[in-house]
């Protein structure tokens, strides 16, 4: 049975993983006949957002501990991710992907990526194993695959431009579409960059996961 490593970035769209995307992805992996295991960096979040009001809260939360909520405890430090034990990689979106895995939300095209997250993602790229990135997470793709790699975040002009400045070649997609860069074996879909509800987000995520598991 194929195994997919899933890297989470916290719990909650504004400061961590987009929960709908993460759960849809885990469900789709199982539905496609594969298994999953979650990972996250053992670091503090950039900040904590009150998801009721949108206000920043004066507290500190750990990305790994928060991500464990989504994974029901079935999670490890991303520093322990061994590419040899998995067939594919998947990164859901949410602002945590751009605040905790990288600092794209702060630095844009000049962003940097967490060391252990970079090591894990590059290990899959170097091994030629497929990877899928959802929502805002595709902004990580140029940091891993380099000049000319293709990906989509939907059709947001500013984010697409940043993707290009980082060395990527952005491809506009609708919410129910996926883009597959066959040369680099990497998939992406807009998810909640465009989705207005769960079912719309699911339309692209399920297609991406089906393809990911098929080519793994």
Regions found by a protein language model. Give the residues of each.
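Active-site-adjacent pocket-lining segments in enzyme domains
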Residues: 5-37, 74-216
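Accessory recognition modules or surfaces
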Residues: 1-8, 12-18, 47-57
């Amino acid at each position: 049975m194929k195994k997919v490593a899933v890297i989470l970035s916290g719990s909650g769209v504004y400061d961590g993983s987009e929960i709908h995307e993460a759960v849809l992805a885990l469900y789709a992996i199982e539905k496609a006949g594969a298994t999953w295991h979650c990972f996250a960096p053992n670091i503090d979040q950039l900040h904590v957002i009150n998801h009721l009001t949108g206000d920043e809260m004066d507290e500190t939360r750990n990305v790994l501990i928060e991500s464990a909520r989504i994974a029901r405890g079935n999670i490890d430090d991303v520093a322990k991710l061994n590419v040899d034990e998995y067939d594919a990689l998947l990164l859901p979106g949410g602002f945590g992907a751009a605040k905790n895995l990288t600092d794209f939300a702060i630095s844009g095209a000049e962003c940097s990526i967490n060391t252990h997250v970079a090591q894990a993602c590059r290990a899959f790229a170097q091994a030629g194993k497929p990877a899928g990135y959802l929502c805002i997470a595709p902004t990580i793709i140029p940091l891993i695959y380099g000049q000319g790699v293709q990906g989509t975040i939907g059709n947001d002009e500013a984010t697409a431009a940043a993707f290009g400045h980082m060395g990527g070649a952005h491809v506009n997609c609708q919410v129910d579409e996926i883009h597959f860069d066959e040369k680099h074996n990497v998939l992406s879909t807009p998810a909640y960059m465009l989705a207005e509800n769960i079912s719309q987000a699911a339309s692209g995520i399920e297609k991406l996961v089906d393809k990911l598991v098929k080519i793994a």
